[in-house]
Amino acid sequence: MRLNASRKPQFRSQIVSPQLCDDIIAYIGPSLQKHKNCDILDINPGIGIWSSELHNFLQPRSHILLESQPEFYKPFLEELSNKPGSKYKLLIGDTGDFATYERLINEGQFPNQTRLNPGDPRLNQLNNTLLVTGSFAYDPVMPGLGFSSMARQVFSQFAKSAWSNELFHAYGHVRMLLWATTDDSQFLVPRSVTQPQKFPMLLQKICTTNVIASPISLPRVSGRQGASRDFRTELEGSAQVFAAMQRAGLEIPVHRRDALCTFAHKFFGKFAANSDLGVQGSLDALIEFERQGMSMQGLLPETVREQVALEEEIAKGIRKEFEIKPVTSTKKPKPILSVDGKRLARLRIQNRAAQKKREMRSALVDKAEEIYQMECFVLTTKSKAGKRETKAKLDVLNAEYKTEKNALNRLDQSLVDTEFDDRLAVRSPLHRLEWDKRSFEPLLIHDNEVWPNSRTALLDMTPKPRPEGESFRDVEYYQDILIPILANGSLTVPQALGSIAPGASQLIEEVPALRDPAKGGRLNMDHFRARMLRGEILDGLVKAYREWPFRPPETDHPKYFQAMSTGTLMLDRR
């Protein structure tokens, strides 16, 4: 059945490119092989193009099509389910109601699956005989309950259900390939330490999440909407990924490369893949690529791209930098700046000033990194003399750093902290963000491959085994305590702990990992911001707080801080 304007889908954007589906399947095909002949639960399949391409590759023994909007998509899906001998089965249900998934299991819609009993070790293992895929790419956004979007609510429940073995995870942990808007994708997998991290930290604890495909990056503009990593750090992270892809023999087709991937293939293919190009070097390299006709949208600031384009057009004679103003006197007319010339002059001034500020901040970030490395030495060296000498140098360097940083305005001070934290996130082997753990870059989705056109991404979520002795109630406590700790990620660790309860900063001494560089710790807690807390450190802080005798008794409820943040009064204590 053809998709036309009279049948324009409402709410959910549809994947309309078989070529995109084929490219995705070819890209992640090796990891899909273990799901051959599995059962598929396909949530909100829509017009079914992604569904049919995935089906053709996996040849599943059963394929449940669970559609929530049959008034739009039933004719498309019946073309699949009504074929003789079809393994498809079309079911109608509310995909935002989690009881729908429980009913599927209770009704025996997966006869090849076995619901496991409590205590069965397979509950904590990946079940490769079932694969979940689906789409919650609503545009405009469909709000969720307690979440800004339905996708975030559903993905949150899907992930947490893995460790409680609810929904389809009753058969063991299930891999999920889920479509969402890029806003939701980047909420779940942040690309900078400045982005909200409360739920992403929980998700990182429960699942490994990869971005398989995404659209072109938005233009890099100034202000809150343009908030992103410094392009120097972006390039350094991309170099690491490019090296990993080379080791794995993985290459993205040319037509699926975004600006970051294009740069990595063209530049790091010739130079050392772990290159830090520096502030000016990064800018010069990106400008050169832009001049060669390779769009660096999302990496180069838009004002720089505009300057490059204007200079190119003036050089080709398409525009004029100067014009001759007619005069009535006998004096020789002088050339004056044209409208384009004035714009170019303003852009050059603006971009030079911005680059000067970048260089100034970078020098301070270099000093902050030097301080961090010296702290790591103090914490790890066995030489008492070396420790004493380094501490003395640290005192001097810290004083210099504080003076120089305080000379900046508040915005630039904040940017120095952000750029240092992002640099550390990329360079640390711990990789504090899930995004920095990626071993491959996402494929590029073109505008005409999603209809109606919207910014859509594909996520690959695979549950991790739940640590022995950790209950799902422990996970709820963990999620709840993250709320005050990460409410303002730019606060220092002592400040963030103080927001949990008065005196809670003393918990620092109960968590040795906080001062273990191998686990993400450092010496000076006043330089350690809450957004950099990860892994064993967060686990240790949660454990220390729950065992702290001075904690307010009401915080024993696993949803206390959630209720406080939303203004909800709780009367029960489960």
Q: Which residues does each PLM region occupy?
A:
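Catalytic cores of RNA-modifying enzymes
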Residues: 1-472
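C-terminal target-recognition/interaction regions appended to catalytic cores
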Residues: 2-3, 412-418, 427-434, 444-574
